[in-house]
Amino acid sequence: PINDSARNFAKNIYGNATPKLITISRLDGRKSHQNIIMTVKNLLPKFPNLKYVSIGDGDERRNLEKLIIEFELEKNVELIFKSTEQEKVSLLEQSDVFVMPSVVYKKSVEGFGIAYIEAASYGKPSVGGIYGGEGDAIKSGKTGYLCNGNDLNAIYENLVKILSDEKYKQLGANALEFSKDFSWDKIIKN
């Protein structure tokens, strides 16, 4: 169970924001954080109370901090470089959508995508990229959507599709059910 301190941490980060987007990963060019941040800017007219939280640190940290300032997104985007496991889980639990539309970066692609399965285990739909292993972790149209992580319009459209339609709750329920296929018990049996 999540402790009160972690729950309060997440409530303080999100405040009254809605919708709440989250990414949990290294700040790496392959993870497409910069494109998510640019998409957040484009989503604000439709979702003015949106909050995007990214948990993790890495080589792209300075570039992302500059981008947030350049786009005046300090109130809408929060980069959390260190967190406890409880805080991370509480933020994920309180979020609406996991977003990490990864791209090919330095000839490297996303592997299996365990982060999407973790999000699914909390009933969160995901938006992921088309180039790596995300297709094994996200069933497009059922547990979230896959899109070209270099295409800001595709990221935008998929997030709007999830956030504007009550059906997104069904995507989360489907994701939760799908995540059970990745339990150790199931993996051992297969």
Model-identified regions with their sequence ranges:
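C-terminal alpha-helical cap of glycosyltransferases
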Residues: 184-190
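Short acidic alpha-helix that forms the nucleotide-activated donor recognition element
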Residues: 62, 84-95, 121, 139
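Acidic donor-binding loop of glycosyltransferase active sites
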Residues: 93-108, 124
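Nucleotide-activated donor-binding/catalytic signature segment of Leloir-type glycosyltransferases, i.e.
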Residues: 62-86, 97
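Short hydrophobic beta-strand element within catalytic cores of glycosyltransferases
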Residues: 116, 121, 125-128, 138
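Conserved donor-binding/catalytic core segment of Leloir-type glycosyltransferases
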Residues: 13-31, 37-40, 53
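A short, well-ordered alpha-helix in the C-terminal region of glycosyltransferases
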Residues: 44, 154, 167-181
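Conserved acidic donor-binding segment of nucleotide-sugar-dependent glycosyltransferases
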Residues: 139-141, 145-152, 161-166
